[in-house]
């Protein structure tokens, strides 16, 4: 996985987290939860991409 792709996914997750924190501060818990889920999904995508690169596509997700 190229470094620029890693940086892109990290920044994308960071933006979701920052937006979620602002939503939570303003009392919009539902929107905050949605944004935290998106951030989590982005981080899972990043982790899975790195895992595939290291171990190949034969690894199991635990």
Predicted regions and their residues:
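Short, charge/polar-rich alpha-helical segments
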Residues: 1-10
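Short, charge-rich amphipathic interface segments used for partner binding and complex assembly
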Residues: 11-62
